[in-house]
Amino acid sequence: MRSECPECSNDLLDMVYDYESVRWKWDAEFAKRPFNMWRYRELLPVRDISNRVTMGEGGTSLFRAHNVGMMLGLRHLYVKDERQSPTGSFKDRQASLAISVLREMGVTEAVLASTGNVAISYSAYSTHAGIKLWAFLPSMVPGEKMREIALYGTEVIKVTGTYDQAKQVARDFVVSRGLHYDRGFKSIAARESMKTLGFEVAEQLADLLGPSEKAPLQVPDWYFQAVSGGMGAVGVWKAFLEMKEMGLVDRLPKLASIQVSGCAPMVNSFHRGLEVAEPVLNPQTLVSTISTGNPGAAYPYLRSVVLEHGGAFVKVADEEAFRAMHVMAKMDGISMEPASAVAFAGLFKMVSQGQIQPDDVIIVNCSGHTFPVEKFLLGDDWERSVEVAGESGTAPELHEEGLLASLENLDQRTNRIAIMEDNLDSARLLRRVLQAQGEYQIDEAHDGREGLEMVRKNPPDLILLDLMMPEVDGFGVIDALKADERLQDIPVIVVTAQELTTSEKRRLDGQVHRLLQKGTFLSTDIMEDIDDILS
């Protein structure tokens, strides 16, 4: 495969296909094939399918993040779950196609530089294909990932320096040994592989939401991805361009490229109006897998996409990414690596800034799994030990008095919170937020009359109150609380779906400590208010 144009020597080449022929095959043959990335083989740069190196990559699920969507006020928030890939990251798509091309070219030994996930994927697939691999890794890559790479038999070279410095050392090694070097973003196979993610999303959305008005497949309004070198976002964008060329979709999405603040050359350069990215020479981030200081040719391409079609370049702090990790795991059961969480943190930020509309269809690439969990993400108090063995090694007898005393002590140190909410989904969400963030005794009522009876029987430390309820609404509940000496000092957080008038806000004065708009707060926002009130 050529590495540069024979006429102009440009080393950023692109693939063009017979789209008319592929369009016919898409209708006639693609649907009969297994749902994986090789379903779209006519749009991939492998001439002979027998050279394919596959381990079941692609065909990952697309599902709705129901709880987080409710929390953010988004009706159509979907997660593309690339954690299901053979090595746990979307880079398996890249490895499968790139190693297939190497096999077709007769390459038996190759070199790459990586911040972690690419090296893991390439190590697995090169071993599967019988190709020897050398991986040059910057020293910031966690030791766990380096050991996993070595487990596959890859020669691991740890470079004391940045990722860009590791790439230079790798290139020097290639020159001295005459080996094949994976060119990253400039590799045709690497970029083309990421198209398959976009193809799958369009098919899956059509199944979930129905086809577009003028085309058989469906397009999201926004596609979110954490970017380092930008290859994934570029590949997905090309997928939508090709589908539009073939009449499979009738519009294009907006791309949201999210980076960490400590290494955000694309975001910084875009907001400064630069046409070429200004490199970050010394990345300062714990999210090492997306610490490319110099994104090269990907930035001008993505910049032109955003300027022409809309979209965003957004940066988030490491802490915002770790916060998003906790929110996604505790609210929707989705555990992910920090790099994936960067994309979700970017979504949270854009929602809070009013850039995303409630009816927008959102796809977030959950690009990889977090296993093992990095120690710094949980801190020191993530577990509690319980001794159950007696002197002889058997379990001690539990006396009723001791057990009751323990339960009483538990009640004494656990705050009681009452939820009054008639919408069952909203009540479930509030309960889930509380359960995920701390130890609380939770009482729940679904109308104002029932709620007042509940708090009179067991006065809580705090009330989470919806205003629009049957029987007695939230305003009536507030009036009743104020009139009862036992209840008038209980703090209240009002969670409402509508904007309140000035007179309505006056009715809430005194007892209400905070007013939260449904769909505009994160779980951590409400927990900060709860912690402040209870402390």
Residues of each region from the PLM?
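Charged docking surfaces used in two-component/phosphorelay signaling
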Residues: 428-436, 506
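Active-site beta3 strand of CheY-like receiver
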Residues: 458-464
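Conserved acidic carboxylate
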Residues: 421
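Short amphipathic alpha-helix used as the core "switch/output" element in two-component signaling
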Residues: 437, 453, 475-488, 507
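PLP-dependent amino-acid enzyme catalytic core
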Residues: 1-408
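Hydrophobic/aromatic residues positioned on beta-strands within the core alpha/beta folds
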Residues: 495-496, 518
